[in-house]
Amino acid sequence: MAKLHDKYQETVVAELTKKFGYTSVMQVPRIEKITLNMGVGEAVADKKVMEHAVRDMTAIAGQKPVVTVARKSVAGFKIREGYPIGCKVTLRGERMWEFLERLVDIAIPRIRDFRGLSAKAFDGRGNYAMGVREQIIFPEIDYDKIDKIRGMDIVITTSANSDEEGRALLDAFNFPFKK
């Protein structure tokens, strides 16, 4: 079991129950899923690019991503409906906890010129979205084997009802928010 999952069950639940005055353990916010999304617009011109993106995402997430396709044709971007334009993966359970641990302990500290995560990236329902500019911050990515530096979106979906609860949950996991 991942360290963060143990920490959640042993200390975070008690902390949040005390802070927000919950009457039941089931009211305590928890992380439900983490979604990683990588937009690969240049895959329209070169199909190999998508294979590299899928390989990188598989290494980072530990499971194979789903290739996302264009819903509409857009002449300005030279894409047609059904063209592969990205990939995404949804992590739940044990893989989710392991990824979160790697993200907080290893990947985020490796971001260049990092000054803390923005606390304004909550959506009003306690879910947190962040962007990563380089996939090379993850230790699973071999710098010599990448074809291009790509970014990705990371969305942490929680069962929190408000941004305050969501922030308290992520703070308990030592997320480095800006002060």
Curated annotation (Swiss-Prot):
**Primary role:** This is one of the proteins that bind and probably mediate the attachment of the 5S RNA into the large ribosomal subunit, where it forms part of the central protuberance. In the 70S ribosome it contacts protein S13 of the 30S subunit (bridge B1b), connecting the 2 subunits; this bridge is implicated in subunit movement. Contacts the P site tRNA; the 5S rRNA and some of its associated proteins might help stabilize positioning of ribosome-bound tRNAs.
What's a single GO BP term from this record? translation
Q: Name one GO molecular function term.
A: tRNA binding
Domain of life assignment: Bacteria
Q: Which GO terms describe its cellular component?
A: ribonucleoprotein complex; ribosome
The name under which this protein is listed is Large ribosomal subunit protein uL5
**Keywords assigned by UniProt, alphabetized:** Ribonucleoprotein, Ribosomal protein, RNA-binding, rRNA-binding, tRNA-binding
Pfam families noted in UniProt: Ribosomal_L5, Ribosomal_L5_C
Record HAMAP family: Ribosomal_uL5_B (MF_01333_B)
What InterPro entries would the database entry show? Ribosomal_uL5, Ribosomal_uL5_bac-type, Ribosomal_uL5_C, Ribosomal_uL5_CS, Ribosomal_uL5_dom_sf, Ribosomal_uL5_N
Provide the gene name from the record: rplE
Q: Which family does it belong to?
A: Belongs to the universal ribosomal protein uL5 family.
Q: What quaternary arrangement does the UniProt entry report? A: Part of the 50S ribosomal subunit; part of the 5S rRNA/L5/L18/L25 subcomplex. Contacts the 5S rRNA and the P site tRNA. Forms a bridge to the 30S subunit in the 70S ribosome.
Protein's organism: Shewanella sp. (strain ANA-3)
Keyword check for Cytoplasm:
no
